[in-house]
């Protein structure tokens, strides 16, 4: 709300939702229209509240990029029920982004996350773990880009597409599209944009595959054994999954 003037210039609509279900329902605009939308809440309880809207969104698929930014309150320092959002992503086939706790990495995953959503017609979750939410650093900004369609340039004709409604018989087609079309497109995009990262090390006998959000903790653990330094240089090769699912 404090960025109202900037958002107004760009035609971006901001709304404080009454709850997570209402916020997730707003993303439904991306189902039929090339409109990007983002919602944010604290997980996993907030994701429980939004689960109905998320199921409908993931089944129908999206034309515009749809991103759910979640605060993953799990692990050391957490303050709520200890469940993870990973299972929600798998259940609904929502791509789960778990960026390395490093500001340039997080910023890049926001940009590429929207592009991944559009390329695969699938909503994405960007989870920020406790350590990612407390990270310090800096990043290079880019110029703001106004959306093609907004309140300043509205879409003239409404779209009504029965195939986007998650009811029989279309829900069965949607389930097939998840595997036959959306998943292959997502994999191609992830590989082309190199969203996952590889860090080489001189010890080639073993390697570690880890989720992006675990990177800092892994480096710290390796440090204790003399296998990494404070600057993130690991002797053991690391394959970091910024796209966890």
What is each residue range found by the language model?
Residues 100-245:
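Flexible, low-complexity linker and terminal segments
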Residues 1-104, 131, 194, 200-205, ...:
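Thiamine diphosphate
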